[in-house]
């Protein structure tokens, strides 16, 4: 298969608003997708992820930087000469053709023999479990079946690189979950280099060997799913990765004896430990923001006398079946905590709440950079 290398890639558009001038949709992005890797590019709508994928495919010009496959620069190659197959959100199947003919179409254009076309179609159909649908038209298929056909049409070409542009967005939740499993299986079986774009962080976390997180055209962080979740580099990644989102709490950093704490208000403080990241040790009296995942907030109806805990009121809760999401009021903020479904929760109840210091992240309010406990 192939290794894909992006070096200082940028995409610049001439903005229609003359006062704003040129607009950078992608700004100086560099990373390498390793041979046989499943790389996911994730970010909110408008972050530039689909633009970046289209640049890799050759559907958008590269304004600055170089794009290479296996060390060969392909900036000026047409899409058809890049040996790349792309699967879109809208399937793009020919409605008047059968599944067989849709899958075989590209091979027919390349003058493959009838026997080789049949062999490849049958192999691919078996892999995707659509043998029984080969002689049906797309309009008679379910959304999941149509997406399998679109993927099959890409696989049958045996390209160096597969590109997926939000291919599951049109499917319902149950089908999306099923297709995620099938894509994982497909990647293992064909052992191909895949680049997958989505706005859905669940897809990103379950599919990617590594994930590139984009925001406003910039690469915010590239790492494994677990590293992104546990060790985000910045506030954006900390808040974007994870559902429910991370809790963020602002306050003034104080010190009492050998212990640091965050003063959220004159009558509410949060202990943050006897040690904090070095950049904040001389920031006593300055604004600080901390973050903590919902599963790391400890709530109880009984106070632990060995720890510093404060009472917070339940504003709302969601019963998810296996757990509850409890929404707690902290001054003008709402915090989310996970709690066992077996524990009773009612709106208006007050719980003792503890924020374990070793589970906190520390955020520089000036640039959003995240620091972790030493």
Q: What is each of the regions a protein language model found here?
A:
Residues 5, 32, 68, 352-354:
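ABC ATPase nucleotide-binding domain
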Residues 29-40:
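Pre-Walker A (P-loop) beta-loop-beta motif of ABC nucleotide-binding domains
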Residues 65-73:
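Conserved ABC transporter NBD signature motif
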Residues 255-374:
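Non-catalytic connector elements of ABC transporters
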């Amino acid at each position: 298969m192939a290794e894909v290398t992006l070096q200082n890639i940028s995409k610049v558009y001439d903005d229609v608003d003359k006062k704003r001038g040129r607009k950078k949709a992608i700004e100086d992005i560099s990373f390498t997708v390793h041979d046989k890797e499943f790389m996911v590019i994730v970010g909110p709508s408008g972050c530039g992820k689909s633009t970046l994928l289209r640049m890799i495919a050759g559907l958008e010009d590269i304004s600055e930087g170089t794009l290479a496959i296996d060390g060969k620069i392909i900036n000026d190659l047409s899409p058809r000469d890049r040996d790349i197959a792309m699967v879109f959100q809208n399937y793009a199947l020919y409605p008047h053709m059968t599944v067989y003919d849709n899958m075989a179409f590209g091979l027919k254009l390349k003058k493959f023999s009838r026997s080789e076309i049949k062999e490849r179609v049958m192999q691919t159909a078996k892999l995707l479990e659509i043998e029984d649908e080969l002689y049906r038209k797309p309009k008679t298929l379910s959304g999941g079946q149509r997406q399998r056909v679109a993927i099959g049409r890409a696989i049958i070409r045996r390209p160096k690189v597969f590109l997926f542009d939000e291919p599951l967005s049109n499917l319902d939740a149950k089908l999306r979950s099923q297709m995620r499993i099938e894509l994982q299986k497909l990647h293992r079986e064909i052992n191909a280099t895949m680049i997958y774009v989505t706005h859905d962080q669940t897809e990103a976390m379950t599919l990617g060997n590594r994930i590139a997180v984009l925001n406003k055209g910039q690469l915010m962080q590239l790492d494994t799913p677990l590293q992104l979740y546990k060790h985000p580099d910045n506030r954006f990644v900390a808040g974007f990765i994870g559902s429910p989102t991370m809790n963020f709490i602002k306050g003034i950093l104080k010190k009492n004896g050998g212990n640091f704490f965050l003063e959220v208000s004159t009558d509410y403080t949060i202990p943050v430990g006897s040690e904090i990241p070095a950049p904040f040790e001389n920031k006593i009296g300055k604004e600080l923001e901390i973050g903590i995942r919902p599963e790391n907030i400890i709530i109880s109806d009984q106070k632990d006398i060995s720890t510093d805990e404060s009472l917070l009121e339940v504003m709302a809760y969601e019963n998810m079946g296996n757990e509850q999401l409890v929404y707690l009021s902290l001054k003008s903020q709402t915090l989310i905590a996970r709690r066992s479904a077996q524990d009773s929760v009612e709106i208006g109840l007050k719980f003792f709440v503890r924020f374990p210091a070793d589970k906190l992240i520390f955020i520089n309010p000036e640039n959003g950079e995240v620091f972790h406990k030493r």
